[in-house]
Protein backbone atom coordinates (compact mmCIF):
# COMPACT_ATOMS: atom_id res chain seq x y z
CA UNK A 1 0.00 0.00 0.00
CA UNK A 2 2.76 2.42 0.94
CA UNK A 3 4.56 1.52 -2.34
CA UNK A 4 1.48 2.54 -4.37
CA UNK A 5 1.16 5.83 -2.48
CA UNK A 6 4.84 6.64 -2.97
CA UNK A 7 4.65 5.91 -6.69
CA UNK A 8 1.50 7.99 -7.21
CA UNK A 9 2.83 10.97 -5.26
CA UNK A 10 6.16 10.86 -7.05
CA UNK A 11 4.47 10.79 -10.48
CA UNK A 12 2.27 13.76 -9.54
CA UNK A 13 5.08 15.94 -8.22
CA UNK A 14 7.49 15.28 -11.08
CA UNK A 15 4.86 15.92 -13.73
CA UNK A 16 3.14 18.97 -12.24
CA UNK A 17 4.05 22.58 -12.87
CA UNK A 18 5.77 24.15 -15.86
CA UNK A 19 9.52 23.92 -16.22
CA UNK A 20 11.48 27.15 -16.35
CA UNK A 21 12.30 28.33 -19.84
CA UNK A 22 15.64 27.02 -21.08
CA UNK A 23 18.33 29.57 -21.79
CA UNK A 24 19.83 27.45 -24.58
CA UNK A 25 17.79 25.54 -27.14
CA UNK A 26 18.11 21.78 -26.87
CA UNK A 27 16.43 21.36 -30.27
CA UNK A 28 18.46 18.87 -32.30
CA UNK A 29 20.91 18.22 -29.47
CA UNK A 30 22.05 14.63 -28.99
CA UNK A 31 24.07 12.76 -26.40
CA UNK A 32 25.41 9.27 -25.79
CA UNK A 33 23.76 8.96 -22.40
CA UNK A 34 22.71 10.64 -19.15
CA UNK A 35 22.19 9.51 -15.58
CA UNK A 36 21.53 10.97 -12.13
CA UNK A 37 22.26 8.99 -8.97
CA UNK A 38 22.04 9.45 -5.22
CA UNK A 39 25.69 9.78 -4.17
CA UNK A 40 25.25 8.12 -0.77
CA UNK A 41 23.70 4.90 -2.07
CA UNK A 42 24.34 4.82 -5.82
CA UNK A 43 20.60 4.43 -6.44
CA UNK A 44 19.65 5.62 -9.94
CA UNK A 45 17.21 8.54 -9.85
CA UNK A 46 16.92 8.91 -13.64
CA UNK A 47 18.70 7.67 -16.73
CA UNK A 48 18.59 7.75 -20.51
CA UNK A 49 20.68 5.36 -22.63
CA UNK A 50 23.11 5.31 -19.70
CA UNK A 51 24.92 2.22 -21.02
CA UNK A 52 25.66 3.65 -24.47
CA UNK A 53 29.38 3.93 -25.19
CA UNK A 54 31.03 7.31 -25.65
CA UNK A 55 34.37 9.05 -25.33
CA UNK A 56 34.81 11.01 -22.07
CA UNK A 57 37.57 13.41 -23.25
CA UNK A 58 38.95 15.26 -20.20
CA UNK A 59 36.44 13.59 -17.89
CA UNK A 60 38.99 10.76 -18.11
CA UNK A 61 41.09 12.81 -15.67
CA UNK A 62 38.65 11.90 -12.90
CA UNK A 63 40.18 8.42 -12.73
CA UNK A 64 43.68 9.91 -12.54
CA UNK A 65 42.38 12.22 -9.80
CA UNK A 66 40.80 9.30 -7.93
CA UNK A 67 43.96 7.18 -7.99
CA UNK A 68 46.15 10.01 -6.71
CA UNK A 69 43.74 10.83 -3.87
CA UNK A 70 43.34 7.18 -2.91
CA UNK A 71 47.12 6.78 -2.79
CA UNK A 72 47.30 9.86 -0.56
CA UNK A 73 44.55 8.48 1.67
CA UNK A 74 46.47 5.20 1.97
CA UNK A 75 49.64 7.14 2.88
CA UNK A 76 51.47 5.98 -0.24
CA UNK A 77 51.80 9.58 -1.38
CA UNK A 78 52.06 13.00 0.26
CA UNK A 79 50.15 15.76 -1.50
CA UNK A 80 52.83 18.23 -0.43
CA UNK A 81 55.70 16.21 -1.91
CA UNK A 82 57.54 17.70 -4.89
CA UNK A 83 57.32 16.33 -8.42
CA UNK A 84 60.16 17.02 -10.85
CA UNK A 85 58.81 17.51 -14.35
CA UNK A 86 60.10 15.10 -16.99
CA UNK A 87 60.42 15.71 -20.72
CA UNK A 88 57.53 13.36 -21.43
CA UNK A 89 55.13 15.52 -19.41
CA UNK A 90 56.00 18.58 -21.52
CA UNK A 91 55.25 16.94 -24.87
CA UNK A 92 51.48 16.68 -24.67
CA UNK A 93 49.24 19.18 -26.44
CA UNK A 94 45.78 20.54 -25.77
CA UNK A 95 44.84 22.24 -22.51
CA UNK A 96 47.93 22.64 -20.32
CA UNK A 97 49.89 24.78 -17.87
CA UNK A 98 53.08 24.67 -19.97
CA UNK A 99 55.23 22.63 -17.64
CA UNK A 100 58.97 22.84 -18.32
CA UNK A 101 61.57 20.10 -17.90
CA UNK A 102 63.15 20.27 -14.45
CA UNK A 103 60.47 22.44 -12.84
CA UNK A 104 59.20 21.21 -9.48
CA UNK A 105 55.65 21.39 -8.19
CA UNK A 106 53.80 19.80 -5.31
CA UNK A 107 51.35 17.02 -6.08
CA UNK A 108 48.67 19.35 -4.72
CA UNK A 109 49.49 22.10 -7.24
CA UNK A 110 49.45 19.59 -10.09
CA UNK A 111 46.01 18.43 -8.94
CA UNK A 112 44.72 22.01 -9.10
CA UNK A 113 46.08 22.24 -12.64
CA UNK A 114 44.45 18.91 -13.49
CA UNK A 115 41.01 19.78 -12.15
CA UNK A 116 40.71 23.50 -12.96
CA UNK A 117 42.72 23.97 -16.14
CA UNK A 118 42.19 20.35 -17.26
CA UNK A 119 45.93 20.30 -17.88
CA UNK A 120 47.07 17.33 -19.93
CA UNK A 121 50.72 17.91 -19.02
CA UNK A 122 49.78 17.78 -15.36
CA UNK A 123 47.96 14.47 -15.92
CA UNK A 124 51.11 12.93 -17.39
CA UNK A 125 53.30 14.33 -14.60
CA UNK A 126 50.97 12.89 -11.96
CA UNK A 127 50.78 9.53 -13.73
CA UNK A 128 54.57 9.26 -13.71
CA UNK A 129 54.67 9.83 -9.95
CA UNK A 130 52.67 6.64 -9.42
CA UNK A 131 54.00 4.33 -12.15
CA UNK A 132 57.26 3.90 -14.09
CA UNK A 133 55.49 4.65 -17.39
CA UNK A 134 52.23 6.25 -18.50
CA UNK A 135 51.19 2.89 -19.97
CA UNK A 136 51.54 1.21 -16.58
CA UNK A 137 49.54 3.97 -14.91
CA UNK A 138 46.77 3.49 -17.48
CA UNK A 139 46.78 -0.21 -16.57
CA UNK A 140 46.14 0.87 -12.97
CA UNK A 141 43.27 3.04 -14.18
CA UNK A 142 41.65 0.07 -15.92
CA UNK A 143 42.19 -2.20 -12.93
CA UNK A 144 40.50 0.31 -10.64
CA UNK A 145 37.64 0.73 -13.11
CA UNK A 146 36.96 -3.02 -12.95
CA UNK A 147 37.05 -2.93 -9.15
CA UNK A 148 34.40 -0.19 -9.19
CA UNK A 149 32.14 -2.18 -11.51
CA UNK A 150 32.79 0.07 -14.51
CA UNK A 151 32.21 -2.85 -16.86
CA UNK A 152 31.98 -0.84 -20.09
CA UNK A 153 35.02 1.36 -19.55
CA UNK A 154 38.48 1.18 -21.10
CA UNK A 155 41.10 3.88 -20.64
CA UNK A 156 44.02 4.48 -23.01
CA UNK A 157 45.37 7.70 -21.45
CA UNK A 158 45.50 9.54 -18.11
CA UNK A 159 44.02 12.70 -19.69
CA UNK A 160 41.49 11.87 -22.41
CA UNK A 161 43.23 13.74 -25.23
CA UNK A 162 43.08 11.41 -28.22
CA UNK A 163 43.17 12.06 -31.93
CA UNK A 164 41.67 10.88 -35.21
CA UNK A 165 40.71 7.23 -35.38
CA UNK A 166 42.01 6.63 -31.86
CA UNK A 167 42.28 4.53 -29.88
CA UNK A 168 40.04 6.56 -27.59
CA UNK A 169 39.14 6.32 -23.93
CA UNK A 170 35.69 4.71 -23.80
CA UNK A 171 33.04 4.66 -21.09
CA UNK A 172 29.34 5.12 -20.32
CA UNK A 173 27.32 7.57 -18.27
CA UNK A 174 26.56 4.81 -15.75
CA UNK A 175 30.22 3.91 -15.31
CA UNK A 176 31.22 7.54 -14.75
CA UNK A 177 28.56 7.81 -12.05
CA UNK A 178 30.09 4.78 -10.30
CA UNK A 179 33.50 6.44 -10.41
CA UNK A 180 32.16 9.62 -8.85
CA UNK A 181 30.21 7.85 -6.13
CA UNK A 182 33.63 6.62 -5.02
CA UNK A 183 35.12 10.11 -5.37
CA UNK A 184 32.59 11.53 -2.92
CA UNK A 185 34.00 9.26 -0.20
CA UNK A 186 37.36 11.07 -0.34
CA UNK A 187 37.36 14.13 1.90
CA UNK A 188 40.08 15.92 -0.10
CA UNK A 189 38.29 15.67 -3.45
CA UNK A 190 36.11 18.76 -3.01
CA UNK A 191 39.11 20.90 -2.06
CA UNK A 192 40.03 20.72 -5.74
CA UNK A 193 36.70 20.30 -7.53
CA UNK A 194 35.01 23.23 -5.75
CA UNK A 195 37.97 25.58 -6.23
CA UNK A 196 37.02 28.21 -8.82
CA UNK A 197 40.38 29.97 -9.24
CA UNK A 198 43.99 29.11 -8.51
CA UNK A 199 47.27 30.90 -9.15
CA UNK A 200 49.60 28.26 -10.59
CA UNK A 201 53.34 28.91 -10.63
CA UNK A 202 53.31 32.35 -8.94
CA UNK A 203 55.84 34.71 -10.50
CA UNK A 204 56.75 35.83 -14.00
CA UNK A 205 55.34 32.67 -15.63
CA UNK A 206 52.22 32.52 -13.47
CA UNK A 207 49.09 30.91 -14.91
CA UNK A 208 45.72 31.96 -13.52
CA UNK A 209 43.53 28.85 -13.51
CA UNK A 210 39.74 29.15 -13.82
CA UNK A 211 37.52 26.13 -13.26
CA UNK A 212 35.83 24.98 -16.47
CA UNK A 213 32.74 23.80 -14.57
CA UNK A 214 30.38 26.78 -14.92
CA UNK A 215 27.74 25.08 -12.77
CA UNK A 216 29.88 25.95 -9.73
CA UNK A 217 28.67 29.53 -10.21
CA UNK A 218 25.16 28.92 -11.51
CA UNK A 219 23.77 25.86 -9.71
CA UNK A 220 23.12 26.09 -5.93
CA UNK A 221 25.20 23.63 -3.93
CA UNK A 222 27.31 22.49 -6.88
CA UNK A 223 30.87 21.62 -5.83
CA UNK A 224 32.25 19.30 -8.53
CA UNK A 225 33.40 17.56 -10.67
CA UNK A 226 34.72 17.84 -14.27
CA UNK A 227 33.90 18.82 -17.84
CA UNK A 228 35.35 17.52 -21.09
CA UNK A 229 35.28 18.26 -24.80
CA UNK A 230 37.07 17.18 -27.96
CA UNK A 231 35.95 17.00 -31.58
CA UNK A 232 35.80 13.21 -31.36
CA UNK A 233 34.09 13.06 -27.96
CA UNK A 234 31.76 16.11 -28.04
CA UNK A 235 30.83 17.72 -24.71
CA UNK A 236 30.59 15.81 -21.43
CA UNK A 237 30.20 16.66 -17.77
CA UNK A 238 30.06 14.83 -14.47
CA UNK A 239 28.75 17.16 -11.81
CA UNK A 240 27.46 17.01 -8.26
CA UNK A 241 25.59 19.14 -5.76
CA UNK A 242 24.42 18.92 -2.16
CA UNK A 243 21.00 20.04 -0.97
CA UNK A 244 20.12 19.59 2.71
CA UNK A 245 21.02 15.99 3.59
CA UNK A 246 21.32 14.70 0.05
CA UNK A 247 23.99 14.71 -2.64
CA UNK A 248 23.29 13.84 -6.27
CA UNK A 249 25.64 13.11 -9.15
CA UNK A 250 24.64 13.87 -12.75
CA UNK A 251 26.39 12.73 -15.93
CA UNK A 252 25.93 13.92 -19.50
CA UNK A 253 28.15 12.03 -21.94
CA UNK A 254 28.87 13.13 -25.50
CA UNK A 255 26.48 16.05 -25.97
CA UNK A 256 26.39 17.56 -29.48
CA UNK A 257 24.37 20.43 -30.91
CA UNK A 258 23.68 21.57 -34.49
CA UNK A 259 24.46 25.08 -33.21
CA UNK A 260 28.13 24.22 -32.63
CA UNK A 261 30.53 23.19 -29.89
CA UNK A 262 30.05 26.21 -27.61
CA UNK A 263 26.28 25.78 -27.53
CA UNK A 264 26.72 22.03 -27.04
CA UNK A 265 28.74 22.77 -23.90
CA UNK A 266 26.04 25.11 -22.59
CA UNK A 267 23.29 22.61 -23.41
CA UNK A 268 25.34 19.91 -21.66
CA UNK A 269 25.45 22.04 -18.51
CA UNK A 270 21.75 22.84 -18.80
CA UNK A 271 20.81 19.16 -19.06
CA UNK A 272 23.05 18.31 -16.09
CA UNK A 273 21.37 21.00 -14.00
CA UNK A 274 17.93 19.63 -14.86
CA UNK A 275 19.02 16.12 -13.93
CA UNK A 276 20.18 17.29 -10.51
CA UNK A 277 17.01 19.30 -9.91
CA UNK A 278 14.81 16.32 -10.76
CA UNK A 279 17.01 14.15 -8.56
CA UNK A 280 16.55 16.45 -5.59
CA UNK A 281 12.80 16.56 -6.22
CA UNK A 282 12.64 12.78 -6.02
CA UNK A 283 14.70 12.74 -2.84
CA UNK A 284 12.42 15.37 -1.29
CA UNK A 285 9.49 13.02 -1.91
CA UNK A 286 11.50 10.25 -0.30
CA UNK A 287 12.17 12.40 2.79
CA UNK A 288 8.51 13.34 3.15
CA UNK A 289 7.21 9.81 2.74
CA UNK A 290 9.83 8.31 5.03
CA UNK A 291 8.89 10.82 7.72
CA UNK A 292 5.20 9.89 7.34
CA UNK A 293 5.86 6.18 7.60
CA UNK A 294 8.15 6.62 10.60
CA UNK A 295 5.47 8.72 12.29
CA UNK A 296 2.88 5.99 11.68
CA UNK A 297 5.27 3.35 12.97
CA UNK A 298 6.04 5.39 16.09
CA UNK A 299 2.34 6.03 16.73
CA UNK A 300 1.53 2.31 16.52
CA UNK A 301 4.42 1.23 18.78
CA UNK A 302 3.19 -0.01 22.21
CA UNK A 303 4.23 2.19 25.13
CA UNK A 304 4.31 1.74 28.90
CA UNK A 305 4.32 -1.47 30.86
CA UNK A 306 4.76 -4.53 28.70
CA UNK A 307 5.93 -2.51 25.70
CA UNK A 308 8.44 -4.06 23.36
CA UNK A 309 12.00 -2.97 24.25
CA UNK A 310 13.46 -0.42 21.85
CA UNK A 311 15.76 -1.78 19.17
CA UNK A 312 19.51 -1.30 19.61
CA UNK A 313 21.09 1.66 17.81
CA UNK A 314 22.08 0.79 14.25
CA UNK A 315 25.63 1.14 12.98
CA UNK A 316 26.45 3.58 10.15
CA UNK A 317 26.66 0.70 7.65
CA UNK A 318 23.30 -0.69 8.81
CA UNK A 319 21.68 2.74 8.48
CA UNK A 320 23.14 3.16 4.98
CA UNK A 321 21.81 -0.27 3.96
CA UNK A 322 18.37 0.61 5.34
CA UNK A 323 18.49 3.97 3.51
CA UNK A 324 19.28 2.18 0.27
CA UNK A 325 16.34 -0.15 0.83
CA UNK A 326 13.98 2.80 1.33
CA UNK A 327 15.21 4.43 -1.86
CA UNK A 328 14.92 1.23 -3.88
CA UNK A 329 11.35 0.80 -2.66
CA UNK A 330 10.55 4.37 -3.70
CA UNK A 331 12.20 4.51 -7.11
CA UNK A 332 11.96 0.96 -8.46
CA UNK A 333 8.61 0.83 -10.20
Language model regions located:
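Hydrophobic alpha-helical membrane context
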Residues: 14-15, 73, 290
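Alpha-helical structural signal
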Residues: 10, 65, 111-112, 180, ...
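Hydrophobic h-region of N-terminal signal peptides that target proteins for export
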Residues: 8-18
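Sec-dependent signal peptide recognition
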Residues: 2-7
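Active-site-adjacent loops and short helices of periplasmic peptidoglycan-processing enzymes
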Residues: 19-174, 184-187
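Domain-terminus/edge residues, biased toward the C-terminal soluble/receptor-binding domains
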Residues: 150-154, 165-333
